[in-house]
Amino acid sequence: MASNVEDTLIKLDRLHSVDYKNDEVQLIKSKIEGIVHQISNRIGELNPILSNSVVHCGSFYHNSKINAPDEFDFLLVLNKFSQPGVCSCKPFEDPEYTHLVSLGIDNTKLNWNPQSVLEWEEDAANKQTLLQATIDSEYRNAVCSCLATMSLPDGISLTTSQKSVRRRFEGGEEFLANFKFSGPALTLLLNWKGVYYPNLNISVDVTYVIAMRGLPSFCNLDKRLPSEHLIVKAGLCADASHELLYCRMLDDTWKQTCSVLENKIICFWFKENDASNVCYRLLKIIRNLVTPVNQLGEAFLKTYALKTLFLYECEQFPDSKFWRTDELSTHLLTIFQKLLSAIQNRFLPNYFNENQNALCYPLDSRPEDENEEGENKFISSVYEAMCKIIEDIISSLEKGLASEQTLKFYFEPGQKIVIKDPDIQDALEKEN
């Protein structure tokens, strides 16, 4: 039987999790998917070389979305470029960046001959760079052409983001009022007018990728897991693929990611036992309620760090019997203790690339002599506030386990700590 603390955690999850059985949630899902498939089809019609398949990704599609159905993630897999033998990879010239590769495209296998590239450029390396830049520019042109004429379903309209100011000064981004490009990603900013959600802003990320068979070069998942591990037995490593995302600022360089595999692994664990999903949602809920944010309301502790810790925990304890709703507080306590240790070390190994840090700035940084005083103060302030909050979370869970307190800490959270990011502040002042 669940204790008071477990009952409280289950109540907290129900209070903040998206109700997937809600008809309006399913209606929003259907309309968003319709928009994305319309974009996908239209891109292929406008430019057949960019014909693509839609892949659903992100928290909404493994039933771990919290608060509202306000974020959707999709990949557009470029079918022709993802065919075997069309694209080849070699390690990036700087070994420090193991997640980057240089791409070669055999355009003769595609019957693709963009005249502006092939007629005027003789150098093979430059030709490759231009070919890859052409993919990106033609994708953007197709998207803009599509959105200019696309009609939206009833109840949904284009809107602008409250974070528009930030988007305007982020490097490498182009803000276009109702949608923006960030590298290979398109973000649509939409608004839903419904009954349960009368005024819901929704962001939809649509990212074009090239799919490659096998695990990426930096990933040792298949080597670190024994053959009897559930992930291996389920064939998730043997049937794995990874994606390439175009890095526009680095010539022919592409970033290797494991978005589809990550999604499959998370869905696999959640299918084994729903208690693990509850635990993962609670990690995000507690983060949202009590951890520090910047002046735009964005958490310094990103979801990816929590996801990374959760995946490691599932890998270490794969038995579905381990994940029980009457032991939620114990699971949360363990994960937050590991999170505190990672933040104190300023390093959390990425789940798929253990040499890469899953913590983001400023949590991955230490004050340095060469930094400006304001930046060092900012890094120290975020670090100290984050450690203090996580220590409080750990203490509340320990007290809950010891005395079965009801964890009012999460139902009556105090005012959030807001720490101003000097980069954002400078840009805001320039805007004004």
Curated annotation (Swiss-Prot):
Phenotype upon changing D73N: Abolished nucleotidyltransferase activity
Annotated positions binding Mg(2+): E71, D73, D205
Write out the coiled-coil annotation as residue ranges.
Answer: none
Q: Which GO terms describe its biological process?
A: innate immune response
Q: Which residues bind GTP?
A: D205, K255, Q256, T257, C258, S259, V260, L261, E262
Q: What EC identifiers does the entry list?
A: 2.7.7.86
Q: Which UniProt keywords apply?
A: ATP-binding, GTP-binding, Immunity, Innate immunity, Magnesium, Manganese, Metal-binding, Nucleotide-binding, Nucleotidyltransferase, Transferase
Q: GO MF terms on file?
A: 2',3'-cyclic GMP-AMP synthase activity; ATP binding; GTP binding; metal ion binding
Q: Does the keyword GTP-binding apply?
A: yes
Q: Which family does it belong to?
A: Belongs to the mab-21 family.
Q: What does this protein do?
A: Nucleotidyltransferase that catalyzes the formation of cyclic GMP-AMP (2',3'-cGAMP) from ATP and GTP and plays a key role in innate immunity. Directly binds some unknown ligand, activating the nucleotidyltransferase activity, leading to synthesis of 2',3'-cGAMP, a second messenger that binds to and activates Sting, thereby triggering the immune response via activation of the NF-kappa-B transcription factor.
Q: What is this protein called?
A: Cyclic GMP-AMP synthase-like receptor
